[in-house]
Amino acid sequence: EQLLLVQQPGFWNKKPMFYSYDRNPRCTAYIPYNCGRAYVSGGLNGGTSAAFLAMCKELDRRTEQDIRNGVVPLWHDESQLNRYAAEHPGSYRLLPPTYWYPEGWQMPFEQKIIVRNKSRYFDVAAVKHHSQHTRSWLQCKWEAFCENYLP
């Protein structure tokens, strides 16, 4: 176990056939329906420097290949990470969703690391270039205040 991955909270109680793996065979992140034992989150991972850098280099190689082929994985880096995990069972320690607990969710786990809802702090669509309309810093703060403190 040279790597550290965390189970994606949206799939902790689902069977592998229902995981949202990339099912496009043209993509280097492709995972067939009969493969994969865990669905991992792309937001928290680590490991020994050698293992982590080797993983990063492999994921970079696959990403570049997909770009050359005009393919974008379903969940981008998370899809690539899941393919890597499926190909390397036993090479990583899988942490439970308690270490990647989304803000506002109710799951039967103790919250150890809370993942904040980024849309409360900035305009996600504008950052991803899906919208020309951006909210100011003050608008984001006001909306977060209203959501957290007003009835």
Predicted regions, residues:
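Conserved donor-nucleotide/metal-binding helix-loop-beta segment in metal-dependent transferases, i.e.
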Residues: 1-29
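Catalytic core and acceptor-binding pocket of nucleotide-sugar-dependent glycosyltransferases
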Residues: 27-125
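Juxtamembrane luminal stem/stalk of type II transmembrane Golgi/ER carbohydrate-processing enzymes
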Residues: 137-151
